Amino acid sequence: MCIRDSCKAAALLGAVVMMISALAGCGKNTKVVLTAGLKKNEVFRISSASCVLPEVMVYLTNMQNQYESVYGSQIWNASDGQLSLEQEEREQVLTQLARIKVMNLLAQKKEVTLDDKEKERAAAAGREYFTSLNSAEVTALNVTQDLITKMYEEYALAEKVYQTIVENVNPEVSDDEARTITVDMIRVSDSAKASQVLGKAKEEGVDFETLAQAESEDQTVTQSFGKGEVPEALEKAAFNLGKDEISDVVESDGSYYILKCISTFDEAQTKANKEKIVKQRQSEAFDTEYTAFEQTLVRQLNEELWNSVTMIHQDDVKTSSFFEVYQMYFQHQE
């Protein structure tokens, strides 16, 4: 793979992981019952929502091939000492699918549905992805076009119920709340040295950035941050500085800091921080409603079937576009 293709693949993988992560997670308080009345190919059921083995294999195989296109097939040999990376990926897929099923149940409760145009998009996406599969992939995944379309519908409905819940979150964020400050920072681990460096910093004609590069124990000198992003002592010292002012020695978590304010307000950074704060509010609002709903549900897991699930290692099973096709038909048409 050439460097350009590798970078493109890495960027796509990052987008896929971000999209999946947005819907990932499974509440720890969900009631679990093992293999109670499940059909042969059902991996799990949450209330009336069922997940069958082909759905798991579509997610698992696409994520597997995305990773392998960037990092190679040997990546699955890595381990954190407890679980192999393959086992971790299996668990992530189970979590992702459980989340989507719960969100679809929540959509039913809130009477949120896909409109005709959204269903048409799901059908078109299902048709495109299914026709991209070769015969070996269809056999290995054991999928039909109807199942793929259903999976796209459920993913789209999960995103739609999320948007329905967060649409009333207050989008107004003040400049002060979102303000980002930029400082040059010196960090040392010795109090006496910090006092010595502070004396140098306040000498007339001394270039603070050059001093920081020479004295700081951190490689990065210039940093930008908003409120709540650094320890309280550093935040208070930084936000009390005017442009070009130098702080006294600030102690935090066993280290000693000296700050020089480069900018008290960065318009671009503040705008980006406002968007970040709104997204955080939205996430918190959704999580509150989702968690309360999820705790009322019973989840049944076909443990024997789940334990038999493994990645497919076949040269003729390389499908990796399931999530890319979804993005093309939904996220690119908003």
Spans of features found by a protein language model:
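Short, low-structural-confidence N-terminal segments
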Residues: M1-Q87, E91, Q300-E334
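Charged, solvent-exposed helices and adjacent loops that form client-binding or oligomerization surfaces
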Residues: M63-Q92, Q108-E177, S191-S195, E203-E204
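Peptidyl-prolyl cis-trans isomerase
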Residues: V197-L234, S263, E267-A272
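Proteostasis/folding factors centered on peptidyl-prolyl cis-trans isomerases
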Residues: T139-R187, A214, E232-E275, K318-E334
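Surface-exposed patches in mature extracellular/periplasmic domains of secreted proteins
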Residues: E111-E118, D207-A212, S247-V250
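FKBP-type peptidyl-prolyl cis-trans isomerase
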Residues: A36-S69, K101-A107, E154-I165, T182-D190, ...
